[in-house]
Regions:
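Conserved beta-ketoacyl condensing-enzyme motif
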Residues: 6, 10-16, 107-123, 138
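Active-site-adjacent elements of ketosynthase-type condensing enzymes
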Residues: 12-34, 52, 78-94, 118-130, ...
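A short beta-alpha structural unit
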Residues: 75-80, 112-120, 145-152
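Short glycine/serine- and small hydrophobic-enriched flexible loop segments
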Residues: 56-59, 161-168
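Single conserved hydrophobic/aromatic residue that forms the stacking wall/gate
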Residues: 1-9, 173-176
Length: 176
């Protein structure tokens, strides 16, 4: 028999970030890395985790008497597609504008932004500038990746749940 093994099968997905020079060199110091939005950031740290959100139409949830934790009132997505670790400020801003338009909200109605916050220099700078240009300097922004690392496919669900809990408790987190 002949067996084939692709590089994709042999290497963990997380090694892609090493190849892109996007990972922190401070993995041995979890209390100081990753540091999203910090001048001492040096890249992301891969974390492990899992999460799931159950989404359903509001009317259906109400009809069955479900406890509703949160409602998604707007959504926006955009990608420049140029490079995985070099996002564009204008593209990030446009995604946030699309979400506001979909929700029929103004930027003034938003009180907190949970950013992607990978702790990569170019990503954090582009994200900060995009957020600042749309919401102004008053907007608090953080990312749970400072506590968990980048959990790859799980980060959207996990960070969404953390935001739901923060809204419920009317608190926001600081960065690690």
């Amino acid at each position: 028999e002949i067996y084939t093994l692709s590089l994709h099968d042999a290497l963990p997905f997380s090694m892609v970030f090493d190849a892109l020079y996007a990972t922190s060199l401070k993995n041995d110091a979890p209390h100081t890395s990753p540091r999203p939005y910090d001048s001492d950031r040096d890249g992301l740290v891969i974390g492990e985790g899992g999460g799931m959100l159950v989404l359903e139409e509001l009317e259906h949830a109400l009809a069955r008497g479900a406890h509703i934790h949160a409602e998604i009132v707007g959504f926006g997505s955009n990608a420049d597609g140029a490079h995985a670790t070099r996002p564009e400020q204008t593209t990030m801003r446009r995604a946030m504008e699309l979400a506001l338009e979909d929700a029929h909200l103004s930027a003034d109605a938003i009180g907190y932004v949970n950013g992607h916050g990978t702790a990569t220099e170019q990503g954090d700078i582009a994200e900060t500038l995009a957020t600042h240009s749309l919401f102004g300097a008053r907007m608090p922004i953080s990312s749970q990746k400072s506590f968990l690392g980048h959990t790859l496919g799980a980060c959207g669900a996990l960070e969404s749940w953390f935001c739901i809990e923060m809204m419920k408790d009317r608190k926001s987190t600081r960065l690690n």
